[in-house]
């Protein structure tokens, strides 16, 4: 295809010698032919300065007019591993959408605090929030079942499978939209590792050590620690270290070795009690304003969903990498990491039974969600227990490195 003197395009067939034709096909192949066809088709594209189509134009580059921007605030400080996951999720969406959907990713407290973020999403002050439901459990204690408690023996992945394939998403959305009248849609991803019992001045040797202790935790976990005698005080993650340092609280839990270092917990407490049932595998939560979600084109909705799924796997892998590195850093700086006694774990399970009984009395949505989780656990746990070697597996590890 060439331009004539009149400015019109016309196709001219040029016969190449046999050897040249073979070389053309050998070294250019389908990609060159595809580029040739694209160049031909582009002759019909609008001239420079013409309005771009809503799809973002040729090559997937979105014009400003076709770009949708969401303002989403996280519950994490800029140096937190969860903020890294938030930014990776944002990048996945922007890359897969060709820039048609952009995320203005804001760290914690930029527009509002963590407990009020869900209201800001509902009202449209924020288009979304990246957090955990324990931060807004004051709305309805049932939402904290999404990641609090002993998980009925399931792994985080098994629990997340309940959310996506066992009816959990519909139950949660029903609570948020019908019961709480919140204009919000929710997505859960990235099952976390078991969170430590907490950071303490002294080693915890039994459940009685919690009696009279001023302790920081969130969500339904408050009932577990209160059941062991602690006085639970709500403190935002960014203020935990300073609250410990000033004596406002005696001990605290936050999340994982990487986040705990980021928030300065090992600077004020040198004993970390590992293993706990209070949050055996919490799950990250993306909350989106429903009006903005419903207005999003279907292909962009799919991109958000599948970026969440992809971010789930990547987040788990990132956690394994960074948490293990930071575990060693804690040991190297002299932090004592001590296994929680079985007597404390047993006391947590007993306290959880009390929490469940109390919450089930007058909250039918709590009962519905818990029953659904139980039914899922009764199906998947026996299968997983019969088929899988538990991991991590100390037996094969010791055999390999004896």
Go through each PLM region and give its residues.
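N-terminal amphipathic/basic-hydrophobic helices that include classical n-h-c signal peptides
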Residues: 1-12
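N-terminal secretory/targeting leader peptides
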Residues: 10, 15-159, 178, 182-402
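A gly/proline- and charged-residue-enriched helix-loop-helix capping module
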Residues: 156-172
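Short secondary-structure capping/junction motifs at helix and strand boundaries
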Residues: 171-173, 182-183
